[in-house]
């Protein structure tokens, strides 16, 4: 079952208003715009893990909860497009600011009230994990929610209210010398969502993990 706008209309989620922010619709983005420095500059999202391209694994998990999924990538865009997703690059104005560059591009592109993001190098993530984020966001739609487990925070598995997050993020990037995802979240207002299946949060960002 998809937990986007159609699911809300069907009664699976009830639009919840807190202040002026309402959870109405959802898109998903695979973050694949990194430089892959710990992978000898390979494009991580296009590497195989257990026989499947990692960005595809993440994209298919996102498609379990929303039909509107795209990929943020700054190279090999045609190869990413061959996976069956629309591909967007970072805005040149916000380049070289780490994962926040990708977040800015995705928030700018999204046409929904909320955006789910997930990094390309966590190919074991499930739609169930995203569903838990969605329900947290439906209860408090004006906050950023991100996954955490017993080992710490996973801020790039997150759901964000698109319009207000983009406004605050641009201001944050213009004024701050810290390009920390958590620092931005704390400025905006955030909550962690516990996910107890730590194996799904495996970060495949070094050759030894890939093998």
Language-model features: where?
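Nucleotide and nucleotide-moiety/phosphate-recognizing core
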Residues: 22-178, 186-200, 208
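Acidic two-metal-ion nuclease catalytic site recognized across multiple nuclease folds
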Residues: 211
